[in-house]
């Protein structure tokens, strides 16, 4: 149990770092400077004891200590998700080179998914890294099949979802817009290459 708790703590710490990546990468802010994160609203530097995964979020009452700006629940969610995922992967693979590659891949997918969800676009280098990591431990054939299937799925979803939005808002321009992010198809390919066809289908629809 102590071993798993230690792995959980490591996962939570990495989850906090993933939050930094998710915030800074789309805004093209250096990952090195400033070294300390700050409040997006008042730019007040976040003290070390205000940056403890999950715990600080609870004790700060979900708001900035300086300006009382609400802190998004997405931060502790990503930390907890990363922590739990790290423990589960450790239990399955134990400590070896394969575990390191798989953990890096899943961390990358978390960053890709959240950025894609928020901005409908993802950096090419993160996609390339995810695909390379998936190919190391996955199946190229499954990846290509999944990219094709998900591309078709995007067309169908875009047609129906945007048509409904167009009717509700009486805005015909919405019919030509995509309802999914630009990174969804490559991400689907990575999932397919990693999990295989049957598990990949389940993961996509979940």
Predicted regions and their residues:
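Intramembrane alpha-helical segments
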Residues: 62, 68-140
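Membrane-proximal soluble regions of multi-pass membrane proteins
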Residues: 18-74
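N-terminal signal-anchor transmembrane alpha helix
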Residues: 3-27
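Transmembrane helix-loop junctions in multipass membrane proteins, especially transporters and channels
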Residues: 24-32, 91-95, 117, 158-167
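Alpha-helical transmembrane segments of multipass membrane proteins
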Residues: 14-19, 82, 86, 146-154
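Short, Lys/Arg-enriched, disordered terminal segments
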Residues: 1-6, 167-169
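Functional transmembrane core segments of multi-pass inner-membrane proteins
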Residues: 107-206
């Amino acid at each position: 149990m102590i071993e798993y708790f230690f792995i959980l703590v490591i996962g939570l710490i990495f989850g906090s770092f993933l939050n930094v990546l998710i915030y800074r990468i789309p805004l093209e802010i250096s990952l090195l400077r400033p070294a300390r994160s700050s409040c997006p609203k008042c730019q007040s530097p976040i003290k070390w004891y205000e940056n403890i995964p999950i715990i600080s979020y609870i004790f700060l009452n979900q708001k900035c200590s300086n300006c009382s700006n609400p802190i998004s629940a997405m931060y502790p969610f990503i930390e907890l998700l990363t922590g739990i995922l790290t423990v589960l992967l450790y239990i399955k693979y134990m400590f070896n080179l394969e575990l390191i590659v798989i953990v890096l891949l899943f961390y990358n997918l978390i960053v890709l998914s959240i950025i894609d969800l928020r901005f409908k676009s993802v950096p090419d280098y993160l996609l390339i890294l995810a695909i390379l990591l998936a190919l190391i431990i996955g199946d190229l054939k499954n990846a290509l099949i999944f990219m094709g299937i998900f591309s078709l799925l995007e067309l169908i979803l875009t047609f129906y979802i945007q048509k409904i939005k167009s009717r509700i808002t009486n805005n015909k321009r919405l019919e030509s817009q995509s309802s999914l992010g630009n990174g969804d198809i490559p991400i689907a390919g990575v999932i397919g290459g990693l999990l295989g066809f049957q598990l990949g289908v389940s993961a996509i629809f979940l």
